[in-house]
Amino acid sequence: MNGDPVSWLMVEPGWTVVNAHGKKVGKVDEVLGDEQVDIFHGLVVDGKEILAERVADIHEGEIRLAR
């Protein structure tokens, strides 16, 4: 992972998602949240919902899961 962390508002479909060990687990299909009040609910990755509490870090182009 390179660079500084970015906001969940920057995440776009197609970004890579990796597990806590750095192994690729899929790509973002959709970002779940409410931009109006800046609440991040999670992601849809390869058709499966991942809750926000599982997201450890967001860097441009890549999201790392906590577990």
Question: Where do the language-model regions lie?
Answer:
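Peripheral interaction segments used for macromolecular assembly
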Residues: 1-67
